[in-house]
Amino acid sequence: MNKDFIELDGAIGGGQILRSALSLSMLTGKPFRIHNIRAKRSRPGLLRQHLTAVTAAAQISSADAEGTQIGSQSLSFAPGAIRGGDYEFAIGTAGSCSLVVQTLLPALLHADQPSRVRISGGTHNPLAPPFEFLERAWLPLLKRMGAQVEIELLRHGFAPAGGGALVMQVTPSALRPLHLETPGPIHSQQATALVADVPGHVAERELARVGKRLKWPEQALKGIWLDKQIGPGNVLLLEIACGEVTELFSSIGQSGVRAERVADQAVDQARQWLHSGAAVDEHLADQLLLPLAMAGGGSFSTTHMSEHLSSNIQVIRQFLNVEIVCTQANERILRVELRQG
């Protein structure tokens, strides 16, 4: 194993730099040190979901890791061989299960055998992709690239209680390049409001706002009332399926935030993407970058250069010999192309 540590600054990009570095380190066998982890955040250092990602990555790659404590702002990680198998990881709070999935999946596609991974914690969190984003937007594109992976939601988990769980099954498989230039024509759209131990009028008001602002018909507006025991919780999901891509925009209901404001947050994201003409929005762009780098090539158009996309590009360049070219096609579209270096 290469013992020359890659040095990373975690002050920019938040936990995204750490997650990408863990994935890339396991894939390449290159160890890294990261300092100033989440230094600009209100709660700097490792939170429980970041620590779970680190300990999970260390377990599946037999890694030596130092700095693995809540609040730690420095970490070193030196991986061994990636080993498939049956794993179970508990975040212990409502920390995001989805972010742990996105850390582990790239490595498990290169494991020595199939894997089954159960993760418990939060499945619908502020500032993290909900389960449905993985299931309907991200993973279908990875499957088109050749990934053999299935994911199942076992139980919803809302902040702050958590208590959710998902299971992922991965068969080792190689990824092929993917090119996404335009989204294609829209062939379906669906707004879903999930509520648990929250007044029913919250879902009704969210959906009414979506229908009014996006001019979606009533049959495209759906409320789902979950078991009160897993609440309180509320999430609004806007799913837009096009020829090439399914996008999913979400907003998490929180105490003191009006239902109409929750709806507006998701609608604003959707409208920005719809009006841009780009193939993918900023979140899907950021999360496609590493799989395309693994595949050795590909391209997509997106709405703009986000902080996460920029920091992810920097991290990938430090681990892989890949050329990433970003071109401003017009004021609404950024084109990103990856090629073997």
UniProtKB/Swiss-Prot annotation:
It is an enzyme of class 6 (ligase). GO terms for molecular function: ATP binding; RNA-3'-phosphate cyclase activity. PROSITE patterns: RTC. One of its GO terms (biological process) is RNA processing. NCBIfam families: PRK04204.1-2, PRK04204.1-3, RNA_3prim_cycl. Its EC number is 6.5.1.4. Keywords: ATP-binding, Cytoplasm, Ligase, Nucleotide-binding. It comes from Ectopseudomonas mendocina (strain ymp) (Pseudomonas mendocina). This is RNA 3'-terminal phosphate cyclase. It catalyses: a 3'-end 3'-phospho-ribonucleotide-RNA + ATP = a 3'-end 2',3'-cyclophospho-ribonucleotide-RNA + AMP + diphosphate. InterPro entries: RNA3'-term_phos_cycl_insert, RNA3'_phos_cyclase_dom, RNA3'_phos_cyclase_dom_sf, RNA3'_term_phos_cyc, RNA3'_term_phos_cyc_type_1, RNA3'_term_phos_cycl-like_CS, RNA3'P_cycl/enolpyr_Trfase_a/b, RPTC_insert. The active site is at residue 308. Belongs to the RNA 3'-terminal cyclase family. Type 1 subfamily. One of its GO terms (cellular component) is cytoplasm. ATP binds at residues 102, 283-287. It is found in: Cytoplasm. It comes from the Bacteria. Catalyzes the conversion of 3'-phosphate to a 2',3'-cyclic phosphodiester at the end of RNA. The mechanism of action of the enzyme occurs in 3 steps: (A) adenylation of the enzyme by ATP; (B) transfer of adenylate to an RNA-N3'P to produce RNA-N3'PP5'A; (C) and attack of the adjacent 2'-hydroxyl on the 3'-phosphorus in the diester linkage to produce the cyclic end product. The biological role of this enzyme is unknown but it is likely to function in some aspects of cellular RNA processing.
